[in-house]
Amino acid sequence: EKKSKMRSQQLFNAVYKKNIKSFDELTTFGIELKSKIKNLISLDKPKIVDIQKSKDGTIKFLLELKDKRNVETVLIPDKTQSRYTICLSVSVGCYLSCEFCATAQISKKLVRNLSPGEIISQVILCKDYINDWSTNKQITNQVYMGEGSPFLNLDNVKIAIENSKNKDGLEYGRTRITVSTVGIGIKKDNIDAIEWAANALDVYLAWSLHSSISNHRSELMPINDKYSINSLIPQLKKYYEKTKLPIF
């Protein structure tokens, strides 16, 4: 067990810190072990189909996944153009149909959720693009505000965040990651999902409110008809009580 833990730490370090491109680079691993790892884990990243750059330095990537589905990832720079926030997608398509959302203009249905690897590989791909590994440019923050709703893919988002926070991995602090929610009051393991997320994710939470007037919010976000502002506030309070992190 101790040796397995050590090997796991070495593997995480190699993938997330040393940025290995092939498992053959695991020089301290035997041939048999490397063969097992190759059968279990892939280092493949999404294919970059298109890149758009704005005047302020924001970079939008159109990515192609293994099944030829597309998602978008965005890098948002600070004023120095050296520190970036990455906006991550968690699914292909989304059925929530929020009026202001670009995804809703493309797809009115959830095609499929992204795996933990597909989520975290967006970070690795963008780190490669700006050469985060060896220059003064860094992706310092993650926001789960791209395509799809994180609360409709909680299990995979949880694993991706755990890998991001792992000290042998990308080593992001809890205040460097923000998960957005439109306010989905579903149950998860017999408790409210927002309360579940407080324990399981333990990161900043951003509530996509857009209007405090219920009727107006329903026009913008149909999900408000099912999970109203008033029904969500107690859950959000519990999130704050457990994490002591402000909700945006």
PLM regions: where:
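Conserved AdoMet/S-adenosylmethionine-binding subsite of the radical SAM
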Residues: 127-248
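Glycine-centered loop/turn positions within well-structured domains
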Residues: 21, 96, 214
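A short, flexible beta-alpha/helix-coil linker loop
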Residues: 18, 103-108, 212-214
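Short linear Ser/Thr-Pro motifs
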Residues: 54, 89-90, 180, 208
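Beta-strand secondary-structure signal
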Residues: 60-62, 87, 204-206
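Canonical Radical SAM [4Fe-4S] cluster-binding loop centered on the CxxxCxxC motif
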Residues: 78-125
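Flexible, acidic/Gly-rich N-terminal and inter-domain linker regions that tether
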Residues: 1-84
